[in-house]
From Swiss-Prot:
Compositional bias segments (type: Acidic residues): 57-67
Protein name per the record: Nitrate reductase [NADH] 2
UniProt keyword Lyase, yes or no: no
Known function: Nitrate reductase is a key enzyme involved in the first step of nitrate assimilation in plants, fungi and bacteria.
Tissue specificity of this protein: Root, leaf, and shoot.
Organism for this UniProt entry: Arabidopsis thaliana (Mouse-ear cress)
InterPro entries: Cbr1-like_FAD-bd_dom, Cyt_B5-like_heme/steroid-bd, Cyt_B5-like_heme/steroid_sf, Cyt_B5_heme-BS, FAD-bd_FR_type, Flavoprot_Pyr_Nucl_cyt_Rdtase, FNR_nucleotide-bd, Ig_E-set
Domain (FAD-binding FR-type): residue spans on this chain: 660-772
Miscellaneous comment: When mutated confers resistance to the herbicide chlorate.
Binding-site residues, heme: 577, 600
Length: 917
């Protein structure tokens, strides 16, 4: 049945104040968004409940004081709502909805549709939004729908609370209204995609074209989430309650096109239980019951957060240990690094990295007056008085906007604006609403200006960046908002200033960014190329490319590299590369001659010719940014799994920040562990610097040996969070020892000969496996989980295994069980044995270690020979129940002929449950 909001359904609601009288009368009584608005129905008037129901969470605040505050707020809100609804035309059944599942919903005809007919995603025209002032009329509030709007009945609706709670419950709407005290406050809601079209004009994101009106302010009333969770007896953190998940009722095409998915997301328990955050299960907006587009009959409101966390048509609240696993929780509302495109994000699991999730809004501001294409005549009248610039500003997390500044000279000087805060902070001092700003400027100053730009500051002194930071989802765009000015002749004999906003919402054409984009495309048209004077013998039939053109092809969609002046398109080879796609992607768009030569065989060099597409124009080339020293070569398929930069450890200085840069390190200590094993300590460039290498990944050590670049992969033996240095345990392969390798190891012998104080370079991180903690991994970007780890290593292959063991044992809450089989030629060849044995003795329930050597002395307590099925069955878990994950690092014959066949016999799914470093 359609959603009905006849007031007869709300028998348990307390009587309200007088309804708001609007400046028009609907042709038929009834709420405009009701499916029965065209039938006889009582008018849905604005309601404010009696103050006795106001929520009071502080014992030291008397109900009398609280009620007095609520009375004044109710009157204040009532007047603002009355003003905001003035001059508001009726909503209608839009013909564009006629053949959609939303055909029953009445909507305001002025709303700008951003995604065609359906689903309904819209924002108000910016000047219209501002015309109505501080409180946005509900029909003009922006709408974000992922699918059709559910049809709901108040009397039939329930909200289930389950998961880690002592008393799982289902609440009816009448119970939520009558059994809980409520909160009522004004809050600004903002879509994380607000101002996205500006980003789409630079480079297309995955999102549609929000303008700068994806923001609205309403008065919300609802039940505090923390009260509901307390009623249900939410568990403690130790009891497993770490996250609170929300799930709506709509059926959506989630995941890989599967039907029946619900929109869902989650927040941390600490947020959910914090009364200062005013998180509510809202059932009223601007004094009326929720409309269908805004979540009737109940939705989540989380002030200061992005709109994507505020689930509409709320059906379930689930208290969990892990964050929501909902498709929309991971594949939406993320700010990924600018280098990540859609294919890379999917292949390498950027969606699942927690540091890129968006919760709180960032600081933002917009110029609303002058509006787009407004013309200011320049005459004797207008030049005698200042022109008033206006706009809005907001911040997230309850932070107050404390300053707004405007520049008309490109940022050389700034003028401080007057601020209009029309809200009172809550009792915890938090501000949930936008503010308005204004500034009077001289018209002649505008006449000489090329643009007007605005930036805001909040109480934590956060401000907006000057330049845009593009990201795949096009979210949280908050660079300076710029309005361009141009001189025009609006009337004969008169000049004026015409103002241009950067974009217009949706598919509307216009804005200065569209013009600039057109000019850039025209300028980028390829000129006719002449033969390069610097390459007189170059084959003139080959296509020629500039360095700037090569730089553009730096992603998995189009991956070009330069080797010896030749250009190769490696895109179709990415997935076939033995070392993984990121070995190429990390060098995409650069000259990687030196590194290619350092690690590739003659066979590989011949194969490269199949991908040659042209030659590099070298005249005048002097770019440092794509020199060999600034490119990175790796051996893994997960470029995504770089160390979390900045957000995860904001107080730390990370060495491995730029994957295309080499980091100089100095040898400060060298320890001889055995006749052919050394431990090297390298100091990072800055004393307080951390390497920044995720667990499970490795680095490249770079050295110039005999005038040629040499690169080798190593996994540090030091902990990932050690400050100022890192350590490598390296086996030295001396020349003349092994008949198959008479020259020995080039890099290991070089390291052994290095004096203290020598400088080398490192690159990274690299690798397709990352351990996230508590049994969770990402492998080629996809999440995996295991209760038990079967870890098989041979020789120096122990180092990545050692790194994971070290990380697990360091976390007392990580209960992952580890079973290690470590094979070597002799007992003396066992690396890091003292540490392994010490851990096995200290943590017998968490780590078990078994050694295998080809030949042993008398009294050897472990296995002799090679890794066999019998040894594996005795010392590692089988793969029957799927709780174990096997991983191996060692010589290829060991993995190919011993480890993998026997794992298959032990019921391991080799494709899913076996990792090779």
């Amino acid at each position: 049945m359609a959603a009905s909001v006849d007031n007869r359904q709300y028998a348990r609601l307390e009587p309200g104040l007088n309804g708001v009288v609007r400046s028009y009368k609907p042709p038929v009584p009834g709420r405009s968004d009701s499916p029965k608005a065209h039938q006889n129905q009582t008018t849905n008037q604005t309601v404010f409940l009696k103050p006795a129901k106001v929520h009071d969470d502080d014992e030291d605040v008397s109900s009398e004081d609280e009620n007095e505050t609520h009375n004044s707020n109710a009157v204040y809100y009532k007047e603002m709502i009355r003003k905001s609804n003035a001059e508001l035309e009726p909503s209608v059944l839009d013909p564009r909805d006629e053949y959609t599942a939303d055909s029953w919903i009445e909507r305001n005809p002025s709303m700008v549709r951003l995604t065609g007919k359906h689903p309904f995603n819209s924002e108000a025209p910016l000047n219209r939004l501002m015309h109505h002032g501080f409180i946005t009329p509900v029909p003009l509030h922006y709408v974000r729908n992922h699918g059709h709007v559910p049809k709901a009945q108040w009397a039939e609706w329930t909200v289930e609370v389950t998961g880690f709670v002592k008393r799982p419950m289902k609440f009816t709407m009448d119970q939520l209204v009558s059994e809980f005290a409520y909160r009522e406050f004004a809050a600004t809601l903002v879509c994380a995609g607000n101002r996205r079209k500006e980003q789409n004009m630079v480079k297309k994101s995955k999102g549609f074209n929000w303008g700068s009106a994806g923001v609205s302010t309403s008065v919300w009333r609802g039940v505090p989430l923390c009260d509901v969770l307390r009623r249900c007896g939410i568990f403690s953190r130790k009891g497993g309650a770490l996250n609170v998940c929300f799930e709506g009722s709509e059926d959506l095409p989630g995941g890989a096109g599967t039907a029946g998915s619900k929109y869902g997301t989650s927040i941390k328990k600490e947020y959910a239980m914090d009364p200062s955050r005013d998180i509510i299960l809202a059932y009223m907006q601007n004094g009326e019951y929720l409309t269908p587009d805004h979540g009737f009959p109940v939705r989540i409101i989380i002030p200061g957060f992005i709109g994507g966390r505020m689930v509409k048509w709320l059906k379930r609240i689930i208290v969990t240990t892990k964050e929501s696993d909902n498709f929309y929780h991971f594949k939406d509302n993320r700010v990924l690094p600018s280098l990540v495109d859609a294919e890379l994000a999917d292949e390498e699991g950027w969606w699942y990295k927690p540091e890129y999730i968006i919760n709180e809004l960032n600081i933002n501001s917009v110029i609303t007056t002058p509006c787009h294409e407004e013309i200011l005549p320049i005459n004797a009248f207008t030049t005698q008085r200042p022109y008033t610039l206006k706009g809005y500003a907001y911040s997230g997390g309850g932070k107050k906007v404390t300053r707004v500044e405007v520049t008309v000279d490109g940022g050389e000087t700034w003028n401080v604006c007057a601020l209009d805060h029309q809200e009172k902070p809550n009792k915890y001092g938090k501000f949930w609403c936008w503010c308005f700003w204004s500034l009077e400027v001289e018209v002649l100053d505008l006449l000489s200006a090329k643009e007007i730009a605005v930036r805001a500051w909040d109480e934590t002194l956060n401000t907006q960046p000057e330049k845009m930071i593009w990201n795949l989802m096009g979210m949280m765009n908050n660079c300076w908002f710029r309005v361009k000015t141009n001189v025009c002749k609006p009337h004969k004999g008169e000049i004026g200033i015409v103002f241009e906003h950067p974009t217009l919402p949706g598919n509307e054409s216009g804005g200065w960014m569209a013009k600039e984009r057109h000019l850039e495309k025209s300028a980028d048209a390829p000129p006719s190329l002449k033969k390069s004077v610097s390459t007189p013998f170059m084959n003139t039939t080959a296509k020629m490319y500039s360095m700037s053109e090569v730089k553009k092809h730096n992603s998995a969609d189009s991956c070009w590299i330069i080797v010896h002046g030749h250009i190769y398109d490696c895109t179709r080879f990415l997935m076939d590369h033995p070392g993984g796609s990121d070995s190429i992607l990390i060098n995409a768009g650069t000259d990687c001659t030196e590194e290619f030569e350092a690690i590739h065989s003659d066979k590989a060099k011949k194969m490269l010719e199949d991908y040659r597409i042209g030659e590099l124009i070298t005249t005048g080339y002097s770019s440092d940014s794509s020199s060999p020293n600034n490119s990175v070569h790796g051996s893994s398929a997960v470029f995504s799994l770089l160390a979390p930069i900045g957000e995860a450890t904001p107080v730390r200085n990370l060495a491995l920040v730029n994957p295309r840069a080499k980091v100089p390190v100095q040898l400060v200590e060298k320890t001889s562990i055995s006749h052919d094993v050394r431990k090297f300590r390298f100091a990072l460039p800055v004393e307080d610097m951390v390497l920044g290498l995720p667990v499970g990944k490795h680095i490249f050590l770079c050295a110039t040996i005999n005038d040629k670049l040499c690169l080798r992969a190593y996994t540090p033996s030091s902990t990932v969070d050690v400050v100022g240095y890192f350590e490598l345990v390296v086996k030295i392969y001396f020349g003349g020892v092994h008949p198959r390798f008479p020259n020995g190891g080039l890099m290991s012998q070089y390291l052994d000969s290095l004096p203290i104080g020598s400088t080398l370079e490192i690159k990274g991180p690299l690798g397709h496996v990352e351990y996230l903690g508590k049994g969770s991994f990402t492998v080629h970007g996809k999440p995996k989980f295991a209760d038990k780890l079967a870890m098989l290593a041979g020789g120096t292959g122990i180092t990545p295994v050692y790194q994971i063991i070290q990380a697990i044992l360091k976390d007392p809450e990580d209960e992952t069980e580890m079973y290690v089989i470590y094979a070597n030629r002799t007992e003396e060849d066992i690396l890091l044995r003292e540490e392994l044995d010490g851990w096995a003795e200290q943590y017998p329930d968490r780590l078990k270690v078994w050694y295998v050597v080809e030949s042993a002395k008398e009294g050897w307590a472990y296995s002799t020979g090679f890794i066999s099925e019998a040894i594996m069955r005795e010392h590692i878990p089988d793969g029957l129940d799927g709780s174990a994950l096997a991983m191996a690092c060692g010589p290829p014959p060991m993995i190919q002929f011993a480890v993998q066949p026997n794992l298959e016999k032990m019921q391991y799914n080799i494709k899913e449950d076996f990792l090779i470093f």
